[in-house]
Amino acid sequence: VSSLNAASRNTSDALALIGTIDGALEESQEILLRMRELAVQSASDSNTGTDRTFIQDEINQLTAELNRISSATEFNSVKLLDGTYNDKAIQIGTGPNQTFKLGINATDAATLGAYEMQSVTEANAADATLVMGAVGTHASAKSALNDLFNVAADYVVKGSFGTKTANVEAGADAKDVAKAFNLISGTTGVQANAVTRAKISAITGADTYSFTLQGKSTTASTVNATIASTSNLTELKDAINSVSGATGITAALTEDLAGINLVQNEGYDIIIGDVTAATTHTAVSFDTSSPPASSAGATLTSGAAHGLSVGDIVKYTSTAAVTGLTTAKFYEVASVASTTTLTLKTTDGEDVTYGGGGGNANDTLQKVNTINVKTVSKNNTTGLLDDGSVTTLGTATTDDSMAIVGQVSLSSHKAFTVSPGNAANHFNASTNTVTASLKQVGDVDVSSQLGATNALSVIDGAIAMTSEVRSDIGAANNRLEATADNLSNISVNIQRSLSSVEDANFAS
């Protein structure tokens, strides 16, 4: 009986320990919910930079308290939430190995968060400057998801719940890619989100501008705005927002008022076309960096380096070969005159200048002396991709249109991997399996609109992590309560039996 009573006391202690853990986690969740509230507040462009700084100050204080709870929560001088309370045994019976195992991961700001990955974006690409009044073909979309315009893709997602394949059809935009991942999220535990960002900047003169803008609607909307000063684009922002009901594209001024950030929150392509101005020489830049951040997208520049070096071996292909070069032949880079011009050495030792005015927008140069093949295509007339896979040496064009593809973000509160089912993996520069990385809630920065938006999924992951722990210890609590009741019942009945035996012995 005394052993049963000891086991019962152990069980009661374990219930008190679990109650301590749950109470601490409840406070941690309240902190995370407040952080999420602040992130939502900061994500609105009704806030100034100063407002967001003050909001970030509170985020920092909440993060510090989250860490304090993790390090200070203890029971009987034993730390519970710092990651050291693992695989602990609670003796809940009178015999050997009649134990209950309990373990809790750390719940500090460096451990809580979300596992995430994003589709690959370009650091630089071509056709940033669109000359007003010029007529040209539409510029290509600037994203690693470009390939999906022509090629279907399969992604094998291995998540916490199971493994399943996301099937993306040819012609998909970021919205379609995210939908394919969300269709299997019940099996994988991985959620997808698509968003398209662009930026309007570098307007060189006050003028009356007109262009078409297309997002979620199949029909483009016309935007007309007269800009009185290039240092304040309020008129253009208002004109874009006046058609946001049709496009789903919202515009917000940058801090200096001289630029506009465009966002399509559903992941539809942002298509800008037919750009004109009353003064035909006036130029405006459209790029996909909105605002600078690791997941913001590409910055389109019209003078990026070609990325080739002396000694590189390239295969030249063209429908209209430059004089001195033969299509489908191999050449060595003899010299690099500038970031946009180089000299190719022919098999007979002759040097042919290529690039700048000597290039052709239909040319392709394929670098063949490294694992990462570099390819020049007519879709990029000047520019360098961030993964070093594509360079262009042709002359810059005056295209007046472009399509900007969105970015897809995958997120889960558990680790996961994505593997390409075919030759392309748009979540990596290669075809290898990609492992999601943990975005820590301690690194949340809401001092910008984009940072606040990105913080939401990280905080949601942290909330899911703590919810899962509370669910597990809730189940453990229910089990231990049943154990305690059973031990009490056994103890009472054994005591009753012993009393009967003692009474019988006394009577005899």
List the predicted regions and their residue ranges.
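Primary detection of the long, small/polar-rich alpha-helical "axial" segments characteristic
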Residues: 1-290, 296-299, 311, 348-349, ...
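Autoprocessing Asn-cyclization modules and mimics
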Residues: 283-329, 334-345
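Basic helix-extension-helix modules of the SAP/HeH family
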Residues: 317, 355, 360-362
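Histidine-centered active-site/metal-ligand motif
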Residues: 306, 363-366
